[in-house]
Amino acid sequence: MRRVLFWRYWHKRDYNRLGSALTPPSNSGVLMQIVLRGAAAGYEAEHTARIFYPAAELSQTLPDDTADLVLAVAHRYLLLVLVRQNGTTTWVQQRPPQGDARTQEYALCRMLYTMLCGVTGIRPPWGMMTGVRPVRIIHDLRAEGKTEEEIEQRFLQHFDCTPRRFAMAKSIADLQRPVLERAQPMDCSVYAGIPFCPSRCSYCSFVSRTVGDKSSRALVAPYVDCLCKELAATRAAADAAHLSIKTLYIGGGTPTSVNAQQLRQLMGTMAEQFDLPALEEFTVEAGRPDCTDEEKLRIIKEYGATRISINPQTFSDEVLRNIGRRHTAQDILDCYRTARRVGHDNINMDLIAGLPGDTVEGFRHSLQTAIDLDPENITVHTLTLKRASNLVVEHRDADYADVAAMVESCELLEKASYRPYYLYRQKGTLQNLENVGWCKPGYECLYNIYIMEEVHTILSAGAGGSTKLVAPGARHGKIERIFNYKYQTEYIDRFDTILARKEGVKQFYDQYPNCGESARPQAHGGV
């Protein structure tokens, strides 16, 4: 069955025909159709509903009288949430609007959240929080002078976050504090993207092309040429704006899907354009073992990378086949050991909880296998259902009920002396869970902290790149973005426009000649 999110203008006659018989809320977990109405009901109410129905689809058609639905309304004279099941109204809450628009928005979303908890029987681990950066809220509240008790109350009472999730967010904020305190107003990082892969994973919605396809393979060489030119222009833009580059990150896609000569060209450009000894960190996503051999690992090491990622996602051959990977778990083990042999001493490994065909026991096995390899970082993602991914189309009715138990397996990481150092959430993530980076002491990925907490500018190069310009000296102050063309062919064909847009970096920083502290905005993280 599909979960449908309906939008339309609401009138009093619609409420009248929904019925008014009230019975206790059902915990049957019925798949609801949702109607939202009113400016204050819009964005936050939609995403509150998506906590429970992440794969909801949009429509403008009101269901008939027999359909199950949720109605959330924000009018100048009424805030109302109503549930109808089996043709009968089973839950209704209403109240007059009070306070400013944000207070009314929170009141409506709280009623909607409480009702959906009752209808579905679900207690989301992050409560009604809709923001993707919970840790940032702690940093902001501390900056506002809030006490630790007030911050805890904000999470547990205002958001209805579970104590376990709050404790994790707080421990991450504590670990990040010294990193953020030493960040300077004119610091920045540079990201270079390689939007090519050996094959397409079923969960991926990224605009990446497979190098096995002849037409895609023909794009790789001109793409790498353009990327190297853009990196030179990026360095020039950083110099013109008086920015200090602290970290480099080459991601994808799969950067090692290019051949060894092209990888050497890219790495050589990075070494030529950027002062590598002055960097805090230089990460390259080696990614998949089916395109990462010893020669490429040596090139990455030779040109100064200080951190790499080798991303198994799972150590189950069956699950690897399910997601479209063309390698085995043994290939991952061999690649990791080769990386160690050539001298890589800071390695991250990614795992994903909730992949099709995986089990709690299978995920624990994958996690323990990664721990036994002893990498410096292990990042645990929760599967996110994205509409552009094959997984949504092919596995729409799959049962992902075990994913929460998989995520709880991260206790194994704590026992192995790993600690969480960064966290973010995504819309559409199964069970409203999170993605967490774990590290050994002293091996935090600084780029991940900087980009998640938005403490400094990220200059992006490559197709689909999004440069994020952050006002100096102001956490979460003014942010502007410069977008690159999304598709590889467009990026290559319109490359002159890409270069011209680099002028926007200096223009942004010309607004801040003194780079002084500016006022902090009010902290928020959803409602």
Give the positions of each predicted feature:
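Short, conserved phosphate-binding/catalytic loop or strand-edge motifs used
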Residues: 131-136, 172-173, 207
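Short beta-strand motif preference
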Residues: 80-81, 192, 308-310
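Conserved non-cysteine loop/helix-boundary elements of the Radical SAM core domain that shape
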Residues: 208-409
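Local cysteine-cluster metal-coordination motifs and their immediate loop/turn environment
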Residues: 193-208
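N-terminal [4Fe-4S]-dependent radical SAM core
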Residues: 119-123, 143-190, 241
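TRNA-binding/sensing appendages of the translation machinery
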Residues: 403-428
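Radical SAM enzyme core and accessory elements
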Residues: 2-144, 148, 227, 441-527
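Flexible glycine/acidic-rich beta-alpha junction loops that bind and position SAM and/or redox cofactors
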Residues: 318, 322-323, 353-360, 375-399, ...
